[in-house]
Amino acid sequence: ISIDTRRSDVAAAALDAGANMVNDVSGLRDPAMESLVIARGCAVCIMHMQGEPGNMQQNPTYDDVCSEVYESLISTANKLVSKGHDSAMICLDPGIGFGKNLTHNLELLHSRSNSDYSILWGVSRKSMFKQLLGRERTEDRLAGTLGVAAHAMLEGVDILRVHDVEAHNDLLTTLATLRPELNS
């Protein structure tokens, strides 16, 4: 069970209630979050976001989005490990759609970190499919989402965050049947 929060007090309450993973969309910007994650020894997903939720889509800019995003994530993860956190309990999320425009998102989807940390992609129903495919309604973005999920599996992405679990299970089962080497 994962708690999706940027606030260490909320994460602590969720961990007390039985959650075993913190998914922090701010990349551990709350100084107390790092200490909490280390003290509890829980799994953590560190996500990249340029800016804050209220302003993150206002002209996001990068010199090299892939390098900047993954260097930031790896630096944060390495800091946790240097303070005693188990690297196997850390996954990195490049934050598709969080402080990135369509070009940035596509560049990130065409690249992958060469770190030893697990990689998570959360692309389910994202607004990029509105731009890419003209799908206004989120419920009409499944085909695009599944296309990226197939690409993710072929690229070796470790974890997908999805809404349509059954459709993704069918896709990944079919792809693993056709490409057994991907099932390892």
Q: What do these predicted regions represent?
A:
Residues 81-83:
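Conserved C-terminal portion of the radical SAM core fold
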Residues 86-89:
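Short acidic capping loops at alpha-helix termini that bridge into adjacent secondary structure
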Residues 5-9, 15-16, 20-79, 98-184:
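Active-site-adjacent loop and "lid" segments of alpha/beta metabolic enzymes
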